[in-house]
C-alpha cells in the first residue's frame, strides 16, 4: 500500500496527463485536495542527519487520514443499485457501497448518487480515470455524464455484529401471545355484537388515559384554578354572611318597633278601658228626685240673668237657668233664685258629670231618629212654638217698658231659643274671644250640652208661659 504522498503524486500526474487533452476540468474538491497536499509538503521540514536533539526540534506532526471514500454523482434518476453494480464491474476492493435514489422533491434536479469506500488508495485514481465523465444512459436514452470526487464526509457506518436472538420466530409458541389472541378474539366478538358498548368503553378508556396523563405545568394550572375558586367561595360566603347579618339586624329593628307599637297600643287601650269604666261608674249613679239634669253651657261666663226688680245676677257656668213666669210679680223669682242658687249649683255640677257621657252617645241618634220618622210632628211643634212665642213675647214687651233694658235681653234669648227649636239639628254658635270664659277654658261636654240647648230652653219657655206639663212633654 502506497503512502499518501505517492497517491497525491500519482493523482497529480493523472490530472496533468488528462489536462492538455481538454477532456474534463478538475473539480473544486480535487483542487482543494492538491492544495492541502502541497501545504503539507511545504510544512514538513527535512530530516536532519544527526540524531541528537531531533525529537526536541521537530514540530508536532498532525495525523491525517488518507481519503478513501468516493462519491459518484449525477447518475440517472431511474437507475437502480443492481444496474449500477453491473456497469461498475469489475469494481476494485472496497468495504462500503451505498446507493441513494433520486429525490423527487428536487425536480428538475433529479439525480441519483453512490458512495464507495476503497481499501487501496491507488484504486481511487484508476476508478476516477475510468468513470469520471462516464456517460450513463437511462431507459429513455437520455445521457447523464457522471462526476467522481472525494466524499465530503469520510466516515462510514460500521456494521456491528449482533448475536442472534434465541426467541426469533418463536412468538407463536409464546403462552402470553396465545392468551392475548384468545382475549382479542373475544373482544372482536363482543364488538361485532354491540358496537355502541365498544364505543363507550373506548371513550371511557380515553378519558381515563387523559385523566392519568399529567405534567407539572398542568398540576400548577389546576392548583391555581382551585385556589382561585376557593377564594371566590370564601368571598361569596363572606358576602352572604354580611347580608344575613344585615337582614337579622333589620328584622330585630322591625320586631323591636312592633313591640314598642304593641306596648303603646296596649297602654292606650288600657287607658281607654279605664276611662270607659269610670264613665260607666258615673252613669250608674242616679240623680236625686225632683232634679232635671241639664247640659246647657252658658255662652258667657257670668251671664246676666233677668230678675224681677230689673237687677242682674251673674250665673256660674253649668248652672241651669229657668225662666220665671212673666205674669206674676218680679220680686218673687228674685227671692227664690237667691235661696236655691247654692243647691242648684251643687246639683248641676254633680248631674253634669253623670250624664255628660250618656247624652254624648244617645242625643244625636235620638234626634236623627225622631227627625227622620216624625217630620210632621216636628213641623207641627215648630208652628206651635212660634204661636206660643208671640204671647209671652208681647207680655214681656209690655212689662219691659217698666224695666230698664232687661226685656230686650230676654227677647233676644227667646228668639235664639225659637231658632234652636225650629232647626232640625241645633248648631253650635261660635264665641268671640272677648265672650269666652276666663277661668274655664275647656269644658268636655260643651258640644253635647249645646245640642241639648233647644230642649232645655223649651222647658224654660213652658214654665215662663205657664202652659203646664203638656208642652214640657212635647219639648222632651
From Swiss-Prot:
The keyword Hydrolase does not apply. Keywords: Cytoplasm, mRNA transport, Nonsense-mediated mRNA decay, Nucleus, Phosphoprotein, RNA-binding, Transport. The gene is UPF3A. It holds the Pfam family Smg4_UPF3. This is Regulator of nonsense transcripts 3A. GO terms for biological process: in utero embryonic development; mRNA transport; negative regulation of nuclear-transcribed mRNA catabolic process, nonsense-mediated decay; positive regulation of mRNA cis splicing, via spliceosome; positive regulation of translation; spermatogenesis. Disulfide bonds: none annotated. It is found in: Nucleus; Cytoplasm. GO terms for cellular component: cytoplasm; cytosol; exon-exon junction complex; intracellular membrane-bounded organelle; neuron projection; nucleolus; nucleoplasm; nucleus. InterPro entries: Nucleotide-bd_a/b_plait_sf, RBD_domain_sf, Upf3, UPF3_dom. It comes from Homo sapiens (Human). Isoform 1 is strongly expressed in testis, uterus, muscle, fetal brain and spinal cord. Isoform 2 is strongly expressed in fetal brain and spinal cord. Residues 21-38, 250-304, 340-401, 410-437 have a biased composition (Basic and acidic residues). Residues 66-140 are annotated as: Required for interaction with UPF2. The modification Phosphoserine is found at residue 341. It comes from the Eukaryota. Involved in nonsense-mediated decay (NMD) of mRNAs containing premature stop codons by associating with the nuclear exon junction complex (EJC) and serving as link between the EJC core and NMD machinery. Recruits UPF2 at the cytoplasmic side of the nuclear envelope and the subsequent formation of an UPF1-UPF2-UPF3 surveillance complex (including UPF1 bound to release factors at the stalled ribosome) is believed to activate NMD. However, UPF3A is shown to be only marginally active in NMD as compared to UPF3B. Binds spliced mRNA upstream of exon-exon junctions. The keyword Metal-binding does not apply. Belongs to the RENT3 family. Found in a post-splicing messenger ribonucleoprotein (mRNP) complex. Associates with the exon junction complex (EJC). Interacts with UPF2 and RBM8A. Interacts with DHX34; the interaction is RNA-independent. Its main location: nucleus.
